[in-house]
């Protein structure tokens, strides 16, 4: 059995089915990407599964991908996400995009922004030490 066939077998063992979209991409891409997808989407990594799905959902919302949004919503729910958490993720996804749009529209000086972020970080560190 070749690498592609072994990959399909592993996908079926992991997901219960080999989704059609996985069969539709080039074989070499699937054999390279599947181990990474399996590890970082479904396996153990530094970021807990529910939080990985929140990240994926926030990105999905910003790139306006219904496929990704559906998958990340389902997987977040499977990993214990509550309705309140999902609502917060939706807000944070829109909030980040909105502020990014405002900074770009203002053509705010990036070097100034960097300095201000560092100032805020230093202030937050000091405030945290006091508490």
Residue ranges, per PLM feature:
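Iron-sulfur (Fe-S) cluster-binding segments and ferredoxin-like electron-carrier domains
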Residues: 30-31, 71-86
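Short, thiol/selenol-centered motifs that function as redox-active sites or metal-ligating centers
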Residues: 55, 59-71
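Juxtamembrane/interface motifs at transmembrane-helix termini
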Residues: 71-78, 104-112
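Alpha-helical scaffolds flanking conserved acidic
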Residues: 49-55, 83-90
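Amphipathic alpha-helical segments within well-ordered protein domains
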Residues: 38, 56, 73-77
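Short Fe-S-cluster ligation motifs
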Residues: 91-109
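Acidic, glycine/proline-rich low-complexity segments that act as flexible tails and inter-domain linkers
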Residues: 1-51, 105-131
């Amino acid at each position: 059995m070749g690498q592609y066939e072994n990959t399909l077998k592993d996908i079926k063992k992991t997901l219960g089915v080999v989704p059609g979209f996985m069969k539709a991409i080039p074989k070499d891409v699937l054999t390279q990407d599947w181990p990474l997808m399996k590890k970082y989407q479904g396996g153990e990594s530094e970021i807990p599964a529910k939080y990985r799905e929140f990240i994926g959902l926030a990105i999905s919302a910003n790139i306006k991908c219904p496929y990704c949004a559906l998958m990340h919503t389902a997987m977040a729910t499977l990993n214990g996400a509550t309705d309140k958490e999902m609502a917060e993720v939706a807000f944070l996804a829109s909030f980040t995009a909105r502020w990014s749009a405002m900074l770009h529209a203002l053509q705010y000086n990036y070097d100034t922004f960097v300095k201000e972020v560092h100032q805020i970080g230093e202030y937050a560190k000091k405030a945290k030490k006091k508490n």
